[in-house]
């Protein structure tokens, strides 16, 4: 079994591939997901990565953007690509990678869960309450209410994500780091 530890916005993600020779079916888990007894499985077919929650086979929602970015980053590094397509709730979005900076394209008209509280610091910065991972609905609402410019830095726990607005699409950019990788052998 091969494993990789990735880091994004000060959160750790563990990626495991049981079939080492193919690396087409991988399972992703984080500390927060472990507390909620959840893990994702990502199936890679041709140029697509499809996600679903392991425990109930439900499709993964857009709220787990950090996990999506980590798996996309891993895929592009393993297969030496600079772009890939991600499927979330049967909707495709594109992801690009330059060195360790991952950019995910998100459609503006898609629906997202709206957190109850958000705080605009100034026209370029906004923060989310502790425990909220998704910056997209906050950014979308603030942009439409003319509280933010086209580019904003979202401050999340331990890190920052850059959000950019262009052609009715939102682009989320954030650095992802490969902490280490290894192999677990059966004894």
Which residues fall in each region the model found?
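A glycine-rich beta-to-alpha transition motif near the start of alpha/beta enzyme domains, typified by
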Residues: 1-99, 115-187
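Intrinsically disordered, low-complexity regions enriched in acidic/Ser/Thr/Pro/Gln residues
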Residues: 103-106, 113
């Amino acid at each position: 079994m091969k494993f990789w530890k990735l880091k994004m916005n000060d959160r750790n993600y563990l990626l495991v591939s049981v079939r080492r020779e193919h690396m087409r079916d991988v399972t992703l888990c984080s500390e927060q997901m472990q507390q909620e007894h959840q893990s994702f499985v990502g199936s890679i077919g041709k140029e697509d990565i499809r996600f679903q929650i392991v425990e109930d086979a439900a499709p993964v929602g857009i709220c787990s953007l950090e996990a999506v970015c980590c798996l996309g980053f891993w895929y592009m590094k393993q297969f030496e690509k600079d772009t890939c397509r991600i499927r979330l709730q049967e909707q495709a979005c594109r992801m690009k990678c330059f060195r360790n900076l991952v950019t995910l394209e998100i459609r503006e008209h898609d629906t997202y869960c709206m957190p109850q509280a958000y705080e605009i610091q100034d026209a370029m910065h906004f923060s989310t309450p502790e425990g909220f991972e998704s910056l997209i609905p906050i950014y979308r609402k603030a942009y439409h209410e003319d509280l933010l410019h086209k580019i904003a830095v979202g401050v999340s726990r331990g890190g920052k994500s850059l959000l950019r607005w262009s052609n009715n699409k939102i682009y989320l950019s954030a650095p992802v780091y490969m902490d280490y990788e290894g192999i677990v052998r059966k004894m």
